[in-house]
Amino acid sequence: MSLMKSVVLIFASLAVNIAYSAETNPSIQNYWSIAEQKKLDQDITWQRLMYANKNQKSEVTYAGYFLSENGKNNLKEELKADISALFIPTQDNQSIRCKFPARSQWLIQQLGIQENELPQVKCSEFENWIGQIKPYKATLIYATDFMGNPSSMFGHTLLRLDPKDQQQLNLVSYAVNYAATVAGNDNWSYAWKGLTGQYPGEYSLMPYYRKVKEYGDFESRDLWEYELNLSPEETRFLVSHIWEMQHVSFPYYFVSDNCAYRLLGLVDLVKPESHLQEKFNYASIPMETIKAMQQQGLTKAPVYRPALETQLLAQAHQHGASLAKVAHQLAMKPIKDSSETLKSFSPSDQAKILEMAYDDLYLQFIGRKVEESFAQPQLRQLLALRSQIDLDKQRQEPKRPSTEPTQGHNARNVSLKLGEVQGDKFIEIGHRQAYHDLIDPQGGYRAGTQLL
């Protein structure tokens, strides 16, 4: 069970009447007046915290997200209710400051409320949760396209949250993923439901290594990691807001309101001057959203994390086709036969063969091409043979692609073609929202993904 899912919040209504509290507490009325003067209900950050649409109503349908009975439809009423709630004593973990820490922090800062004016609160559930994450910086992860899933045909983005000084251990950092929640077996209608918003999109939190294994091992997708130019304070505020969203879902659309679109909203929240989501009202292609962030100086140079299959292919290229062929055969041979085969090779070549054989068999195993009863003991025995060779690993890191994904051509395309076929002249006007075809430059895209 994920860390986020293991947290249980009781969204009970506050055991007081907010209107009555405002009448008996002059501070509340004073801060209402300040909020009115500053027009906080129109502030871009409040609008984004409330997921306000063009009609000034919230997109959120979960009633527990609002303290005012009419908060969804009247964001000004919700603002007043939230200000009042700050001054109401509650049981542990029930304060607005525990349930909505980002919202509360913003209100306290905007109104200049002093800590000694507020009742003491204990938010052990939230503090334990964020204490495990220790957010200090955020990195946007781009997983290249995966043709085996309609929701991932254009790639996928998620967010990794790194503690301070954990550059070498970021696999154990937590990752925030926004994805469609699919219940049951919907194979026949999956694409249609995803295109028409019939699945709920929800945030989830899990260790980053799980996503690396899923994308890099199981689905053979290279990862590109773009650290965001966010301060530690902005990163913590973003994560505090994710806590607020754990019971909230939105209709998930594969092409428009998808993973990339919602992650843009998180960046917009902590960067009020950015208006990233507004640029993607119709189609949110993950790589195009990263380009938009890059244009605003929000990303740093990416780190390339090749998939396991990419690594194996690179080894085969580096070590030569003949050794790669032996490794492929060795992966499926009984170990006693393997020992005889290896004798005709130098220790260096033996190490290369065994390393490739291990990776080859592991890829077949996770791809369900071989049975576990064979694969597990065979993998252990291949490792044992390799450990007997006193040489450092022979694997070399795959060569980084010369063109990064953000340097590839834009996804959207309008074309005008003139030509002649068997004496018949033609004019063709075309429009494409995403992907590329055979006449587009290959740089930044995986080989073999052209539309025909």
Descriptions of predicted regions:
Residues 421, 436-438:
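Sequence/structural signature of outer-membrane beta-barrel proteins
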Residues 97, 102-148, 153-160, 271:
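Gly/Pro-rich turn-and-neighbor structural signature
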Residues 134-218, 431:
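Glycine-rich catalytic cores of cysteine/serine-nucleophile enzymes that process amide/ester linkages
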Residues 404-410, 438-451:
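Short loop/turn motifs that connect adjacent beta-strands in outer-membrane beta-barrel proteins
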Residues 22-118, 226, 241-423:
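Activation targets extended, charge/polar-rich intrinsically disordered C-terminal tails
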